[in-house]
Amino acid sequence: MRPSKRAPEELRKVTLERGVARYAEGSCLVTFGETRVLCTASLEERGPSWLRGSGKGWITAEYAMLPRATHERNRREVNAGKPSGRTQEIQRLIGRSLRAVVNLPAIGERQIVIDCDVLQADGGTRTASITGAWVALHECFTWMRSRSIISVDPMRDHVAAVSCGIHKGTPILDLDYAEDSAAETDANFVITGSGGIVEVQGTAEVTPFSEEEFLGLLRLAKSGVAQLVALQKQAVG
């Protein structure tokens, strides 16, 4: 039995509530069990200078954790002078994941900034951020179309993310913090609604895992992402 008492293939309770930030063009409060992340999408009329004249837009992301999102208070990274390596890695992952399913020329030479702020962390903050950020971005595109800023929907597909791992020899889906800490293997999968793989991050914490075990985790992740995509569809109507 896994520490959370869930079945091996069972997600935590996931909710996606859009329209939670009054001023943002798009927003979503996402929960994966006790993990809670506020995702917002902000439209900037000017894109990056290096894309000027290309006719393409850009999507970038920033990620942060509130100081007391964890068991003990963490120092705000702004006071350290720069984001940690972990934060930079997650920011880039969120941006890459969203750009993989967006027609960037359809945005025009504009930039959309995704902010993912972790209110409470219990494992899977990066996977929750990607899943919720897609909803916030979808709402931003809807806002842009309603004001004739863009004429077509730039969104080409859904994208969501989920963690998988091997705990006491058993493959499990959507690890919370206790499970992640005790897992022999853990991995994050970013997958599109049509089944395309955007990114895989996997680590053997104890002993190397086999190709067969990896493929088992991939199958588990695809089943989890299919459920998350269904929830995204419900959230955006």
UniProtKB/Swiss-Prot annotation:
Q: Identify the enzyme class.
A: transferase
What catalytic reaction does the record list?
tRNA(n+1) + phosphate = tRNA(n) + a ribonucleoside 5'-diphosphate
Q: What is an example of a Pfam family matching this protein?
A: RNase_PH
| Highest taxon above the source species | Bacteria
Q: What Gene Ontology molecular-function terms does this entry list?
A: 3'-5'-RNA exonuclease activity; tRNA binding; tRNA nucleotidyltransferase activity
Keyword terms: Nucleotidyltransferase, RNA-binding, rRNA processing, Transferase, tRNA processing, tRNA-binding
The record lists phosphate as bound by R86, G124, T125, R126
Q: Does the keyword tRNA processing apply?
A: yes
One GO biological process term is:
tRNA processing
Give the Enzyme Commission number. 2.7.7.56
What family, per the record? Belongs to the RNase PH family.
Stored HAMAP family = RNase_PH
Cross-referenced NCBIfam families, in alphabetical order? RNasePH
Assembly and partners are described as: Homohexameric ring arranged as a trimer of dimers.
**Biological function:** Phosphorolytic 3'-5' exoribonuclease that plays an important role in tRNA 3'-end maturation. Removes nucleotide residues following the 3'-CCA terminus of tRNAs; can also add nucleotides to the ends of RNA molecules by using nucleoside diphosphates as substrates, but this may not be physiologically important. Probably plays a role in initiation of 16S rRNA degradation (leading to ribosome degradation) during starvation.
Q: What is this protein called?
A: Ribonuclease PH
Q: Report the source organism.
A: Methylobacterium nodulans (strain LMG 21967 / CNCM I-2342 / ORS 2060)
